[in-house]
Structures are given as structure tokens and as C-alpha cells.
């Protein structure tokens, strides 16, 4: 269809909310979008209302479209996400930042409290669940977690038991008061406890309390009293470059600046569309704040977000001061990073061009790399890592537990298992442009055979290591072993091989830990199913139980059992 035919058809599209798919002449999905009014939004692509350097390219490729009408904006959001996951379209953006920040999670139970750290936030949790965060990674969260556990779950060093529900409601509210600093005497009380412990020569306890105090005081010092009545306020500032959006987010909790995040967002079809996708992805695993303080120009965008987003753009007062602070931090981040990040993106693009000189493929957007790890064929694992536009795409990384084999060719068979598992659970196979097998000709052959069995047509190459386990050469599409003379490309391929090896070994170590504990913990005298479940509820996995210290374990189980776990008395 030509442009005029498409516009004519669009005039008959529903004005309901929904999801639209732009397609090219081969019916490949180019872009997936969401709209409150499908007809209005889709026509904007052809009247110049959506203006960026990428829009013209997209419009030139559009040959057809599909629409899915939805009852609500929320239903459209879920469908859009599913469609993007399914088709991985060329013009949809993916956040470069994949960090997940820990929240302190407090749950009120009938006969206790459950206090832990969680990187997942469930907005549907009941009023008996309280989140506080997000904390900066590796900073502050654990000392405060341990302090709150000590202050609310223990008395005189012993776990509190046999208390009624009202007692635990009070402990639950006590934590809220501590973290909001509504109880101004608490820090003084804690300081007195620390001095008393030191006077009683309980130096370990005194140091423990001192660590918790240090972090609480840092939080208190950053509190803005005028904002203290608000549980959650986030401040968002941004500026655009040619291909990128740079952003700074400040997180205020009860007026306390608890975290700052700097981000680089790929600029998609337009600034408003890119920001809309950013907000939906960014707050997918975070608490949506009571208010989002933003620059005035952001209010003029049609972001097509749910009514749960409360944007305000202050001109005076305390809110304007924190917005100015976010802009100040943003400018500092931009000056330091914009050239560095732009160079990284350009370099990744250049590396793909250099690699493609050896392959001559139509495009190299998504590359998937396979590797496995095992020792003597015990607990073998496989992994797949994905590079999108030359950059690690950790949201698409996958790991697999493989079936152990004893024959000499097991290493080759493990590649087969990994590829089968990856593509059997992956509907958008046609969106992968290249498979890289970590290995030589045997591994590449096995990868090709496996893909053929699965009726998947994707080119395969290999990365060969030498006897010192260093990258040696590339197995090209014609099964030739080629030594890479381009030093930059060689180093780039080395980085890919190091990354897939790291991911495989990390998964293997975790599987070893799990196999060491799973099904064996109850071999320890006095450790029954309830105690095992309590450990799993707290630590979330056998691997984390394996890594826990005696001190951490003894907060959940008796000290003698904690020592038995650490001494591996279950073996």
C-alpha cells in the first residue's frame, strides 16, 4: 500500500484505546505502540505531529498495520508489553539501564513480622505490607534492615514469640515511625542503647547499633521538613541530545532524599513516546510516588499514561527547590557522560559493521551467544546472552539446567540442549540475526543441526579458544577458521566471550550451592520442614541460604542449627 492508501484506511480505524502495529512489506513488525485514541494517534505519523529523525525512516517503511482494540488503558499497556516482548520491533526502545534497586519490605503477619529486602514491588500488596526505598545498590539497606529486625523481632537477644496480633501491629507501626522520623526521640534512645552496651562490654552489640545509627542519621540529615507529610515523592528532570535522553531521578521518602539515579534513555520516534515508555518500564518494579515533580514542558506532552501518575510542575516553594536540585544533578551527569555514552553507542555500531565484513548479513540487530559450564558432567548448565545493537541486553539473558551426559561428546550435546531450550520458549525467533556458539567447528555444526531440526533459519558462527582459554579465532559462516586482525573487533569479541563465560560460571556456582542444600537440609538434627520453609521465606533461595553467615542464619533458626548449616553437617 502507498501512503495515501494507508491514510485512507486509517480514517476508518476505531477511536477506542488500544494497541497498533506498524508493518513493512514483508509483514515484519516495525513498531508497537499504545494509544487512548487509535485513529488520532496513528494519523499523527503522517501529518508530521510526531517529529524526529527516526519517524521519517519508520514512515518510509510502513506498508501495513494491525490494531487491537482494548477496553481500558491498562489493558492496552499489558497488551503492548506482550507484543513488544513477542516481536522485539526495530523501532521500539529498550532502556539501557537494567538495574533493580532494593526496597525494604515489611509484612504484618498474624504472629510476627517479615522484614526483608526485595527488588520486586507488588502494587497489589495489602495495607499490611509496607515498602521503603529504593535504596542505592550496596548502600544503607542491609544495616537498616538488620537494625529494624533487631529492634522489632528480638528482645534481650532472643526471638520474640507468643505475642498477640496487637503487639505485632504496634511493632509494624514502630517501623513506620522510625523510617519517617516521626519519633524524634528514637535516635537518642538508640544512642543511649549503644553507650550502655559499650559500658557493659557488649562491644559487638555496640558496633552493630553504631552502624545502624550512622545510616539513620544520614537519612535524617537529608530530610526536608516541608515534604515530610508525603510518603513518596519522586523528582524527574531530563534533557535531550541527538539520539539520547539524559535523566536524573531523586527519590524522597517522608521528605528524606533516599536515592538518586542517573539514566540514559534511547531516543525513539519522539521525546514524548520515549518518555512514556520510560515511565512505564521504570516504575514497573517500583512504587509509583504520590507526586512526580517534573519540568513544565513535560506537562505539555501527550504521554498517554494512566491516571495513577500525578505530575506537578512547581514555580515556587520547596517543590521548586528540589526540582532545581534535580536539574543541577542532571547537568553535572550530562557534562560528564554524554560524550562517553554516545561514543559507546557509536563504537558498538562500528563493531557490528566490522563483524559483518566477515559475514555479509542483511542486518545484525540481535545476536544470541550460547555457552555451557560443568565439572566432570556434574550439574551441567547452559546460558544464552543477547546483544541488541551491539550492547548487552540483560533483559533477554537466559540460563538453563541441563541433563547430565557421560559420553565424551557431552560438551557438544550441551550446546544442543541450550539452543533447544532457548528457542522452544522463544516465540520471536525470527528477530535473532545471528547465533554465536562458544566453541569450535563441532559446536557450530551442532548448533546448525539443532536449529534446522527446530525449523529455524538463523546464521551460526563460533568463537574458538586456545589452550590457555583465550579467544583464538572466529568460525565463519562457511566453517572457515579466521584469525581477526582488526584489534578493536578482536577485543570486542573477547568481551563477548568473557561475558558469556562469566554468566555460565555464575549460574553453575549457584546450581552447585542449590544442589548442596536442596533436599539435604533436613538431614540436620532438629531442622524440620517448617524451619526449612522459614529459611526459604527469608533468604528466598537455597543459594542465598548457602551464602548466609552464622549470624544471619541464627536470626531465623537456633544458633546450633545455624552452625550446622554453615559447617555442612547435612552432607
Curated annotation (Swiss-Prot):
GO cellular-component term (any): excinuclease repair complex
Pfam families: GIY-YIG, HHH_5, UVR, UvrC_RNaseH, UvrC_RNaseH_dom
Domain GIY-YIG as annotated: residue spans: 15-93
CDD domains for this protein: GIY-YIG_UvrC_Cho
UniProt cross-references to PROSITE patterns, sorted A to Z: GIY_YIG, UVR, UVRC
Localization: Cytoplasm
Annotated Gene3D superfamilies: 5' to 3' exonuclease, C-terminal subdomain, GIY-YIG endonuclease, UVR domain, UvrC, RNAse H endonuclease domain
Keywords annotated in UniProt: Cytoplasm, DNA damage, DNA excision, DNA repair, Excision nuclease, SOS response
GO biological process terms, semicolon-separated: nucleotide-excision repair; SOS response
Tagged with keyword DNA repair: yes
Domain UVR as annotated: residue spans: 184-219
GO terms of molecular function: DNA binding; excinuclease ABC activity
Matching InterPro entries: GIY-YIG_endonuc, GIY-YIG_endonuc_sf, GIY-YIG_UvrC_Cho, RuvA_2-like, UVR_dom, UVR_dom_sf, UvrABC_protein_C, UvrC
Domain of life: Bacteria
Assembly, per entry: Interacts with UvrB in an incision complex.
Function: The UvrABC repair system catalyzes the recognition and processing of DNA lesions. UvrC both incises the 5' and 3' sides of the lesion. The N-terminal half is responsible for the 3' incision and the C-terminal half is responsible for the 5' incision.
UniProt-listed HAMAP family: UvrC (MF_00203)
Family: Belongs to the UvrC family.
Protein's recorded name: UvrABC system protein C
Species for this entry: Mycoplasmopsis bovis (strain ATCC 25523 / DSM 22781 / NCTC 10131 / PG45)
Native organism taxonomy: Bacteria, Bacillati, Mycoplasmatota, Mycoplasmoidales, Metamycoplasmataceae
Amino acid at each position: 500500500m502507498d501512503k495515501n492508501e494507508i491514510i485512507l484506511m486509517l480514517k476508518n480505524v476505531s477511536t477506542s484505546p488500544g494497541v497498533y502495529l506498524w508493518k513493512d512489506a514483508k509483514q515484519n513488525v516495525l513498531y508497537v505502540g499504545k494509544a487512548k485514541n487509535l485513529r488520532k494517534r496513528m494519523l499523527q505519523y503522517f501529518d508530521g505531529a510526531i517529529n524526529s529523525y527516526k519517524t521519517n525512516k519508520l514512515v518510509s517503511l510502513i506498508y501495513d498495520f494491525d490494531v487491537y482494540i482494548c477496553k481500558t488503558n491498562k489493558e492496552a499497556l499489558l497488551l503492548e508489553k506482550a507484543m513488544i516482548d513477542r516481536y522485539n520491533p526495530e523501532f521500539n526502545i529498550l532502556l539501557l539501564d537494567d538495574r533493580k534497586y532494593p526496597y525494604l519490605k515489611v509484612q504484618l503477619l498474624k504472629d510476627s513480622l517479615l522484614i526483608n529486602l526485595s527488588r520486586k514491588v507488588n502494587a497489589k500488596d495489602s495495607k499490611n505490607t509496607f515498602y521503603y526505598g529504593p535504596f542505592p545498590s550496596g548502600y544503607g539497606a542491609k544495616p537498616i534492615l538488620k537494625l529494624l529486625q533487631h529492634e522489632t523481632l528480638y528482645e534481650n537477644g532472643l526471638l520474640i514469640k507468643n505475642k498477640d496480633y496487637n503487639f505485632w501491629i504496634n511493632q509494624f507501626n514502630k517501623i513506620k515511625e522510625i523510617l519517617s522520623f516521626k519519633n524524634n526521640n528514637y535516635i537518642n534512645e538508640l544512642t543511649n542503647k549503644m553507650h550502655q552496651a559499650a559500658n557493659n562490654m557488649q562491644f559487638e552489640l555496640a558496633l552493630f547499633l553504631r552502624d545502624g545509627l550512622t545510616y539513620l542519621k544520614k537519612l535524617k540529615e537529608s530530610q526536608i521538613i516541608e515534604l515530610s507529610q508525603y510518603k513518596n515523592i519522586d523528582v524527574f528532570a531530563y534533557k535531550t541530545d541527538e539520539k539520547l535522553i539524559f535523566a536524573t531521578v531523586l527519590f524522597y521518602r517522608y521528605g528524606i532524599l533516599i536515592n538518586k539515579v542517573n539514566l540514559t534513555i534511547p531516543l525513539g520516534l519522539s521525546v514524548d513516546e520515549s518518555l512514556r515508555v520510560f515511565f512505564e518500564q521504570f516504575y514497573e518494579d517500583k512504587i509509583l510516588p504520590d507526586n512526580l515533580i517534573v519540568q513544565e514542558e513535560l506537562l505539555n506532552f501527550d504521554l498517554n499514561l494512566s491516571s495513577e501518575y500525578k505530575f506537578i510542575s512547581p514555580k515556587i516553594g520547596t517543590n521548586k527547590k528540589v526540582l532545581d536540585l534535580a536539574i543541577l544533578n542532571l547537568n553535572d551527569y550530562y557534562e560528564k557522560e554524554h560524550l562517553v555514552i554516545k561514543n559507546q553507542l557509536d563504537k558498538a555500531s562500528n563493531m557490528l559493521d566490522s563483524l559483518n565484513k566477515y559475514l555479509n548479513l542483511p542486518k545484525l540487530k540481535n545476536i544470541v551467544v550460547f555457552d555451557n559450564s560443568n565439572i566432570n558432567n556434574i550439574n551441567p548448565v547452559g546460558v544464552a546472552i543477547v546483544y541488541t545493537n551491539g550492547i548487552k541486553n540483560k533483559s533477554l539473558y537466559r540460563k538453563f539446567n541441563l541433563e547430565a551426559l557421560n559420553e565424551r561428546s557431552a560438551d557438544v550435546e550441551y550446546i544442543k540442549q541450550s539452543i533447544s531450550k532457548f528457542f522452544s520458549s522463544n516465540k520471536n525467533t525470527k528477530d535473532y540475526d545471528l547465533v554465536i556458539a562458544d566453541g569450535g567447528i563441532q559446536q557450530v555444526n551442532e548448533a546448525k543441526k539443532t536449529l534446522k531440526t527446530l525449523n529455524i533459519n538463523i546464521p551460526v558462527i563460533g568463537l574458538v579458544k586456545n589452550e590457555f582459554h583465550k579467544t583464538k579465532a572466529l568460525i565463519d559462516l562457511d566453517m572457515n577458521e579466521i584469525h581477526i586482525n582488526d584489534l578493536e573487533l578482536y577485543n570486542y569479541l573477547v568481551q563477548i566471550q568473557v561475558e558469556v563465560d562469566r554468566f555460565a560460571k555464575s549460574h553453575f556456582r549457584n546450581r552447585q550451592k542449590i544442589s548442596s542444600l536442596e533436599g539435604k537440609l533436613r538431614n540436620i538434627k532438629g531442622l524440620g520442614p517448617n524451619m526449612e520453609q522459614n529459611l526459604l521465606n527469608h533468604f528466598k533461595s537455597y543459594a542465598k541460604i548457602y551464602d548466609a553467615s552464622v549470624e544471619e542464619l541464627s536470626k531465623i533458626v537456633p544458633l546450633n542449627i545455624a552452625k550446622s548449616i554453615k559447617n555442612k553437617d547435612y552432607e
